[in-house]
Amino acid sequence: MEDLNFRKGDAKTDVFGSDRMLQPSPVEKIPDGPTTPEVAYQMVKDETFAQTQPRLNLATFVTTYMDEYATKLMNEAININYIDETEYPRIAVMNGKCINIVANLWNSPEKDTWKTGALAIGSSEACMLGGVAAWLRWRKKRQAQGKPFDKPNFVISTGFQVVWEKFAQLWQIEMREVPLTLEKTTLDPEEALKMCDENTICIVPIQGVTWTGLNDDVEALDKALDAYNAKTGYDIPIHVDAASGGFILPFLYPEKKWDFRLKWVLSISVSGHKFGLVYPGLGWVCWKGKEYLPEEMSFSVNYLGANITQVGLNFSRPAAQILGQYYQFIRLGFQGYKEVQYNSLQIAKYIHSEIAKMVPFVNYSEDVVNPLFIWYLKPEYAKSAKWTLYDLQDKLSQHGWMVPAYTLPSKLEDYVVMRVVVRQGFSCDMADMLLGDINNAIAELEKLEYPTPTRMAQEKNLPVEAKMFNHGGRRKTVKK
């Protein structure tokens, strides 16, 4: 047997000449002994080689580009736990400044020095906090009135992101869904009100629907809800899920009323790591005033050296994202954010217009209000096509593009769509490359003599396994 004892794999040995590189990476058990940092780094890095480049991932909403100074700041704070406010008091102050800035972007009426809000790991936790606050306010009022409080519900469109399903299950709150249709592509206020009753804790309109990219009309909902509450004597509030739109609307549509300018909007949540332009995970939630944040949501501990009060589902959380958000606010300012979001929107509109020119496709909506949109195969084209959008997804992935194909939610599940999310770091030149690859893929698919497996599955009404995460959640398989 060959003697390999001469190979110790120490720091002087070339990485690929080390004996550790002859062993597979650990799957079930921690290795018996240590290795050099160079080898460990290379092994972990090699595990990611088969992935797409993040900036070519048009499925994700998550920020995939920040400048070198932002990255440097965040790396320098990577070992700081935000919850240790006694040791890192300036981080806590910076967090408060970010909440102030976000709340004022949403036209907060609060006069206090520090606005009412909370840091979150992402928009999901922010949504949860907004929902829990609405539930606790409703429950407290019902208890004071001596009425039952065991059957709470909330109303939302079928375009909801998966966190709301989690919220309903975890807190045992009924989720009443208003169906989206081709005729009613956003939340219909009147249909939403039909689902309300004395047990409704809130209505949740969405700004930047994950599935479609559209915005619910919050102003119309607020107006209809005001009349409904006056008629019934209820005081059903609105929580706005602005995971994407919360950092788009203030800069591109400042005149549009969707925020705290509206009477019944009491809380708003947003993702900082989407169009807030910060690496994950970061989210924010703000309330119209302190009276709308129940005291029982604040928890205090003293084992960190002082009494620390926090609002959140998570306890420990990274401080680096706070620095990243505050840096972006200072670095870009209002005008800089406006320019970045404007460019993303214009590139999305450009791709939208080019997709409309392609024979097989039709866009779901005529306009693009956020930097994302969806399209599907024309029904007449799909009848004779030997391929599906799942096949186009696979073709594009061969060129590094991640463009998800998926079915729309309930009542629209017969429609398979594709979606593009344009983010900071995606240029017009990259858009042209994408469009070129789409055209080339279509040309190849149209040469097929026989139907693809996904096309045959569609014809037999069999489920097709979704191969790419679309950030909508809810389903592992789709019908068509």
Describe each model-derived feature in a short phrase.
Residues 1-100, 104-111, 132, 138, ...:
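Non-catalytic terminal extensions of PLP-dependent enzymes
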Residues 7-12, 118-299, 304-307, 320:
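Conserved PLP-enzyme active-site core in the AAT-like
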Residues 26, 82-87, 113-121, 270-273, ...:
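A short glycine/serine-rich beta->alpha loop
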Residues 74-81, 201, 205, 324-331, ...:
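A short small-residue
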Residues 90, 119-126, 156, 160, ...:
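Secondary-structure capping and boundary motifs in well-ordered enzyme cores
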Residues 95-103, 160-165, 188-196, 314-321, ...:
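Structured alpha-helical segments in the cores of large, soluble enzyme domains
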Residues 200, 204-205, 226, 230, ...:
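Hydrophobic alpha-helix feature that most strongly marks membrane-spanning transmembrane helices
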Residues 251-370, 376-381:
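Active-site C-terminal subdomain of aminotransferase-like
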